[in-house]
Design a protein with these regions (language model features):
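Conserved small/polar residues in nucleotide/adenosyl-binding loops
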Residues: 97-99
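A structural feature that tracks compact, well-ordered secondary-structure segments
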Residues: 12-19, 24-28, 91
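Acidic/His metal-coordination segments adjacent to aromatic residues that form catalytic metal sites
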Residues: 2-12, 74-94
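Conserved alpha-helical segments that form or flank metal/cofactor-binding pockets of metalloenzymes
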Residues: 23-26, 34-74
Length: 99
């Protein structure tokens, strides 16, 4: 049985899925870049976090479907960083914003 969401809930769900898409792509891209920077250990961590974020997105997508909301396909802007330090700084800032 599909439930209809309020406009407030729709907005919240759209923001949540946009953030999860954002961080999934950001961590995935950092995983690829870290491998190129010869930092296999950190690359593995970025990969694990990207997968976890994709699972979060899946859970939100299930709720979006339940409430019959048309999901956004536009993530919030990503900031990858060019160095490992910049990557970690971007990720830390993003984590603080979403707590």
């Amino acid at each position: 049985m599909v439930q209809k969401a309020s406009s407030k809930l729709t907005d919240m769900m759209q923001q949540a899925i946009a953030r999860e898409i954002q961080v999934s792509v950001q961590y995935m891209w950092q995983h690829i870049m870290a491998k190129g920077l010869e930092s296999a250990e950190l690359a593995d961590v970025f990969e694990e976090v990207a997968i976890a974020e994709m699972k979060h997105a899946e859970k939100i997508a299930e709720r979006i479907f339940y409430f019959d909301i048309t999901p956004t396909t536009k993530p919030d802007p990503i900031k990858v960083g060019g160095t490992l330090k910049q990557m970690l700084e971007h990720d830390a800032k993003l984590s603080l914003i979403h707590i």
